[in-house]
Design a protein with these regions (language model features):
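Membrane-helix and juxtamembrane interface regions of eukaryotic multi-pass membrane proteins
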Residues: 1-230, 250-256, 260-272, 280-311, ...
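Alpha-helical transmembrane segments and their membrane-interface exit regions
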Residues: 238-249
Length: 380
């Protein structure tokens, strides 16, 4: 049964054009071709990425945060309350009004005190500003290096300037070491992002992020073993071209450098729109949808690859909408937060703090919010 499924999965007619077999892609005469087995190394490399990330965040990002004066807002902790804690962990973090009244009777607190307890408890679970800065620093470093390395891999290739050459001789196209390592490192990084997504800072587009990571992993993997490598290198470099700008804008936002953050965000928005909504659909997708049909009839791999590209393009449109909405609010002076942010809740009243098990009032040292929203007065 398993052997039958294995044989069917690797059936040449699924992944290769007509009249071609996997035997045509075996190494010969000093020419090396991509193989599915090459991808096995990406899983241990992904674990290595997680280890490197841990030490990077500890010994590079944390000192950098201190250097840039990234500060936290002092948060009031919710006082111990077994009744409310049990509800919080088992039933929900935002009780409805009827549930608030029930919890009020069970805990002996007023409804206002119960609501305040849940606000504080939710804020306790929200990631710290330092955690956000560390993550942004790590992603910025990778995306910047990956973009530079990717451009170095493709800038001297003829298909970078003439996309019809992407399919010249396909699929009998040998690989070179720079393409191999570019692919393995990119795929390993996205595996590491998927492995760590549960513990990373969660945003409102959490589900979209998962879809993006999975689609990217599938696309990179398929484009490798089906030898769509030339197109794949173009797509990866194009994606990396704007990601490092977004992460750097986040870093400066968390540091309170408002002007720098806003200026970088504007550059990011322009680059994102040009690369994801112009170059990708009208050049790259045109290259992968139209040109192959001039060489061979459509087959399953052709439809599969372009379907995954379509999923990514839909995500790009969704994110472009959020970016443009943020840019409009920024221009009109109405921007209050990142459209994808998990905003920290503030205390609506200080009068009930003592009864709720209060303590000292919150003293904001430096209030870091998502992109383009900060309460600092620092102008750089």
């Amino acid at each position: 049964m398993l052997q039958t499924l294995y044989d069917y999965f690797w059936w040449e007619r699924l992944w290769l054009p007509v009249n071609l077999t996997w035997a045509d892609l075996e190494d010969r005469d000093g020419r090396v071709y991509a193989k599915a087995s090459d991808l096995y190394v990406t899983l241990p490399l992904a674990l290595l990425f997680l280890i490197v990330r841990y030490f990077f965040e500890l010994y590079v990002a944390t000192p950098l945060a201190a250097l840039l004066n990234v500060k936290e807002k002092t948060r009031l902790r919710a006082p111990p309350n077994p009744t409310l804690e049990h509800f919080y962990l088992t039933s929900g973090k935002q009780p409805k009004q009827a549930e608030v009244e029930l919890l009020s009777r069970r805990s002996g607190l007023s409804g206002r005190q119960v609501e305040r307890w849940f606000r504080r408890r939710r804020n306790q679970d929200r990631p710290s500003l330092l955690k956000k800065f560390r993550e942004a620093s790590w992603r910025f470093t990778f995306y910047l290096i990956a973009f530079i390395a990717g451009m170095a891999v493709i800038v001297d290739k003829p298909w970078f300037y003439d996309m019809k050459k992407v399919w010249e001789g396909y699929p009998i196209q040998s690989t070179i070491p720079s393409q191999y390592w570019y692919y393995m490192i990119e795929l390993s990084f996205y595996w590491s992002l998927l492995f760590s997504i549960a513990s990373d800072v969660k945003r409102k587009d959490f589900k979209e992020q998962i879809i993006h990571h999975v689609a990217t992993i599938i696309l990179i993997s398929f484009s490798w073993f089906a030898n769509y490598i030339r197109a794949g290198t173009l797509i990866m470099a194009l994606h990396d071209s704007s990601d490092y700008l977004l992460e750097s804008a986040k870093m400066f936002n968390y540091a309170g450098w408002k002007n720098t953050c806003n200026n970088i965000f504007i550059v990011f928005a322009i680059v994102f729109i040009i690369t994801r909504l112009v170059i990708l659909p009208f050049w790259i997708l045109h290259c992968t949808v139209v040109y192959p049909l001039e060489l061979y009839p459509a087959f399953f791999g052709y439809y599969f690859f372009n379907s995954m590209m379509g999923v990514l393009q839909l995500l790009h449109i969704f994110w472009a909408y959020l970016i443009l909405r943020m840019a409009h609010k920024f221009i009109t002076g109405k921007l209050v937060e990142d459209e994808r942010s998990d905003r920290e809740e503030t205390e609506s009243s200080e009068g009930d703090e003592a009864a709720a098990g209060g303590g000292a009032k919150s003293r904001p040292l430096a209030n870091g919010h998502p992109i383009l929203n900060n309460n600092h007065r620092k102008n750089d």
